[in-house]
Amino acid sequence: MYFAKEDRYEKMKYAYCGNSGLKLPLVSLGLWHNFGDHSNLESMKDILFTAFDNGITHFDLANNYGPAPGSAEKNFGIILKEDFGKYRDEMIISTKAGYTMWEGPYGDFGSRKYLIASIDQSL
C-alpha cells in the first residue's frame, strides 16, 4: 500500500492557471510514454509515486495514449483505484481527445459525437 510523503507540497512551487483560481504545479507529468500496455505496472507506479511524493499533482492523459490507444488511461485508472484513491482529491487529472480511436467516420477528430464518446470512455 502506498503512503504519500507528508512534505510533498513543500517540494514543489504552484502557480495559478490564468484567472481560474486553480493552482497547478510548475511541473506536470504527462503519461504519453511508459504507461501503455507494453510497460510494467510496477514501473508505472514507481513513476507516479515519485512524482506525487515530489509535489506533482497534475497528471496529463489523452484518449489515444498507449500503446494500445486508451491503455494509459486504463492503467492510470487501475493505479488510481488500487493505490492512489485516498489522494484523488489532491490531484488534477486531465485528458484530451482528437486522434483516431476506432474505425468508421466517427472515430477521430472533433465532431460532437466523437468528443462525447471519448469523454464517456475516459471516465
Describe the predicted segments one by one.
Residues 1-92:
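N-terminal binding-site loop/beta-alpha segment at the start of enzyme catalytic domains
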Residues 75-79, 96, 114-121:
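Generic beta-strand or strand-like secondary-structure segments
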Residues 96-102:
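Substrate-binding cleft and catalytic face of glycoside hydrolase catalytic domains
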Residues 102-123:
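Glycine/proline-rich, positively charged
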